[in-house]
Amino acid sequence: MKIIKIWFKGDYLYGEDDSGKTYRQSLLWYKKLRSATAEEREQYTFGFDGIHWRNIDEDVSFESFAYNDAEPTKLQRFFLSHPEINIAEFARLIGMNPSLLRNYINGFKKPSKEREQMIIQKVNNIGKEYMALA
């Protein structure tokens, strides 16, 4: 597959391939693109296997448009939307290996339903603690 046209709308990067099929993926996967200005986003080049934004040093492969997980899970969305959270410290708090939690967040590994619920429950508990301060 080769993407021949791209555009941005809301929190998504869209791409159209050479057969006319449209794909989309969340900008949460691409922190630099997400925070880039419209002008910076327009300064890209197509390469052999992807798209490159030299000014912001970001790359998006053509194949990433066809990934099954182009949309972050609830767990991924939370952590990708809150980069201020120290993943290593949060992992230690819940008794988890920090590398494993990073792999869950980045989509390299998938947690079991039980593990995902446990992580989300701890996030909710911390949120309740913050709300108690209000």
Ranges and model annotations:
Residues M1-A134:
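Motif-centric detector for short Cys/His coordination patterns
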